Amino acid sequence: NIQALKNDLRKTKELLQSEKEKTHTVQAMIEECRDKQRQAEQERDYAEFLKEEKDWLQDYCLFMAIKNEQKGICWIDWPEELKNRHSKAVKEAEKELAEEIEFYRFQQYCFTTQWRKLKAYANKKGISIIGDVPIYVALDSSDAWANPEMLQFDEDYDPKAVAGCPPDAFSATGQLWGNPLYDWKALKKDGYGWWVQRMTHCLELYDVVRIDHFRGFDEYYAIPYGDKTAERGKWEEGPGMDLFHTLDKKIKDLRVIAEDLGFLTESVLEMLKESGYPGMKVLQFAFDGSEDSSYLPYKYDHNCVVYTGTHDNETTKGWLENLQGHDLKFVREYINCYEQPVNDCVWALIRTALSSVADLAVIPIQDYLCLGNEARMNAPSTLGDNWKWRLTANQISETTLYHMREVTRIYGRLAKASEEKETDEIANAEEEERQDNDQNSKIVE
């Protein structure tokens, strides 16, 4: 009997081992099918991506591949046939650099896929993303190389003039940006097609677009190409509202913030008003030596966006630490912080922005954290440590989060979803308390 039991046990083990191997085989087959399915889905996604982004993707990838082959030099210094996009030279480059072109395509696909997931996650959490879009393209860019007809180039594809700003109290020789200028007549003849494509694409990446140098659509400053300063530039007429009427017709739900900082003419103010786009108000600009600045909060209307400071400003703490004399005295008077520490003044300015009538308030995270200029994002017209500051996971404490949320709630700026969640949480807490009270009453009885 014992031997029979041993035999049965051995057979059972063999059977179990066989079943286990079968299970492993089935699992391996299932995993292989899943891998093939994922690969097929990715291939379909990739093909769809190439189709969706065809307006710019091929030109960009070809440009990058050629630029890499040309050791990174600006395209206006490429061999003539490539610089001028001769058909034969372009076809040869596409053939010879096919592998590198495919690398840049797939790189853009990976980024776009990841970005879309990130944006979808943010939107699901009730967070909208504002994208910052410069008015001009860079000279050394695929946009300029692939679309020379929309820019002010001569017959050799060199710029006739470049962008910048005239001399003022801050710069005796002005600002020489060096971007090629648009040929607005040519763009209008094409129905502003490139701008329609650009803004459509931007609004796929972002929920709201902030257009830099909005006044440049009314008048733009043109500096002769090759000049070392901006002193010989002159103002030229831009497209004005004609461009924005076209964009409004072609693009559904066009959400724009107009960067309208600096000196503005009456025609620029009229264009901003007619467009209906909100302009910008920067609190740091309100305390500039006078007590009558248009950036003071009591002068705002609803249709604007208030910032304590932008990426181009000092942090609010750094700005306060560098402020002196009358301006420092006035800002402390304005926010009712006469002797308080600088961090208290930072929070008072945050409250000033949030309590204003501006429809939208933007507070840099550096200000919520009361960081100094070691955390400044960008110092315009300088080289060095710009755009290197990073927020780390351990910098935001639960206490800071609580204060951020409370000050947002107090001034009625909580997102609707957050308000509803808070209301539900309060209602649930009240219901739990009522049930506890009922239970206690029964116990007493």
Each language-model region and where it sits:
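Compositionally biased non-globular segments, especially hydrophobic aliphatic-rich helices
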Residues: 7, 15, 26, 426, ...
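Alpha-amylase-like alpha-glycosidases and glucanotransferases acting on alpha-linked glucans and related
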Residues: 17, 21-109, 137-362, 366-373, ...
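Conserved, well-ordered alpha-helix/loop/beta-strand core segments that scaffold catalytic motifs
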Residues: 104, 108-137
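Structured C-terminal cap/extension of enzyme domains
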Residues: 370-421, 445
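Intrinsically disordered, low-complexity terminal tails and inter-domain linkers enriched
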Residues: 420-444
